[in-house]
Each structure stands twice: as C-alpha cells, then as structure tokens.
Amino acid sequence: MSMTTSSSQLHTQPATTDDAPRIFALYCAAPRYFELLSAPLPTLPEVERELEAAAQDPKRCTELLCEDGQTVGYLDYKLDYPEPGDATVNLLLIPEALQSHGYGRRSIGLLEASLRGRATRVLASVYGSNVRAKRFWYSLGYHFAIDARPVLEWYAKEL
C-alpha cells in the first residue's frame, strides 16, 4: 500500500527481501534505539529472515519511507491486529541523523490517511522505556491504551 500526497515528496514503497541491505543500513543508523531496548543490532541475515516472515503474513506491511530518492525510514505495521479494524505500528524507524525533521510525523499522517475507511483505530507499540517515542505518539493524538510493561506499552488513536 504505497502512500503519497501532493504536498510532499515523502512516499512509501513495499519492502521486500531485496531491500534487506537498505533496512539493515537504517538499523545501523539508529543504534540508540537498540541500546534503549538492550538488544543487539540485528544482522543482515536476521533482517532478511524478518522480511521473509513478514511476506508470509498477509496482514503485515513492511514499507520503506522515501523522499527525493533517499530512504529516510522504515515502517512495519499489521492490519486487523490485535482486533479486527485495528492497525498496529510495530516499528517506525528513522535514522538518528534524520530524526526531528518531521519524517515520522508525516509518515504516520500518510499511514492514517491511507487507513481511513479500512481501520477504526491505530495502535503504536512502544518497547522498553522509550520516553521520546511516548512523547512522539502523544503529540500525534495517541493515548495510553494497553499496559504490557515492562516490555511493551501500546498507544491508540481512533480514526
């Protein structure tokens, strides 16, 4: 599901296993995210396996966020999860050098617009104690919805 708007060059394109090196580079450009989770940076073969698994799940969408020929992020979300009519953002990853430039906000705006009429609620999963991510989702009108701490918190917004 590719999303574009006339006011922006930001768009998405479906990610495939061929895009694993690009996604791996995005992961490498966001080391603080993995430090926050106390998780090792995924290897390229792990990224490839994750994309293969996503391709087998008809409800899961993996997309590259692109602008002016540059990959500026990665979005992984699942439709009709956890309930029918929900869409859950599992990962919105923007390289550290590009954070706070509006890419995340614009990406979620495009996602929400594309889901209207197909989903009634968008959820965002926030792993660990990621205060910055929580502030980001609150700033977009999301509210605390599901407590699965210490591992995960979910934030939600009705469409």
Give short role names for the model-derived ranges:
Residues 5-10, 14-20, 24-99, 108-114, ...:
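Acetyl-CoA-dependent GNAT
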Residues 45, 116, 132-133, 155:
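Short secondary-structure boundary/hinge segments and terminal tails
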Residues 105, 128-146:
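Conserved active-site alpha-helix within GNAT-family acetyltransferase domains
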Residues 2, 153-159:
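Terminal substrate-recognition subdomain of acyl/acetyltransferases
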Residues 91-93, 123-125, 156:
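Short aromatic/hydrophobic contact patches that present stacked aromatics
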Residues 99, 123-134, 150-152:
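Conserved beta-strand-loop-alpha-helix junction that forms the acyl-donor binding cleft
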Residues 102:
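Glycine-rich phosphate-binding loop
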